[in-house]
UniProtKB/Swiss-Prot annotation:
Subcellular location: Nucleus
GO cellular-component term (any): nucleus
Disulfide bridges in this chain: none
Organism lineage: Eukaryota, Fungi, Dikarya, Ascomycota, Pezizomycotina
Tagged with keyword Nucleus: yes
Functional note: Transcription factor; part of the gene cluster 27 that mediates the biosynthesis of asparasone A, a sclerotium-specific anthraquinone pigment important for sclerotial survival. Controls the expression of the non-reducing polyketide synthase (NRPKS) pks27.
Keyword Glycoprotein among UniProt keywords: no
Induction entry: Expression is induced by the developmental and secondary metabolism regulator veA.
Entry keyword set: Nucleus, Transcription, Transcription regulation
Annotated protein name in UniProt: Transcription factor znf27
Recorded name of the encoding gene: znf27
Knockout-associated phenotype: Impairs the production of asparasone A.
Length: 91
């Protein structure tokens, strides 16, 4: 079953990022920050390390790791995650 994530509300984004990161567990791999164009909200999700896993991405920034390289920016209006992992669904 696929769960779809849209951008969180701007005022909740940082708190949700921290809570979700703890809940999902930090695997030590570089996480990906995905930015939504409309609200400017970001979501940091250790499970999404590849832009191809998301159906539409505004911009992704690679954080962590030694190189700190940026992933290519893709133009889009709405951010929707389509992941197979059921643990990522909102409660």
């Amino acid at each position: 079953m696929t769960s779809q994530w849209k951008c969180p509300a701007k005022d909740q984004s940082l708190r949700n990022i921290q809570r979700n990161r703890r809940r999902l567990g930090d695997s030590g791999l570089p996480a990906t920050v995905v930015r939504c164009s409309k609200s400017g909200a970001t979501r940091r999700n250790p499970a999404v390390n590849d832009a191809s896993q998301c159906s539409s991405i505004v911009s992704t920034v690679r954080i962590g790791g030694k190189d700190g390289r940026h992933q290519p920016k893709l133009q889009s209006r709405v951010l929707i995650f389509e992941l197979e992992d059921k643990s990522l669904s909102t409660e």
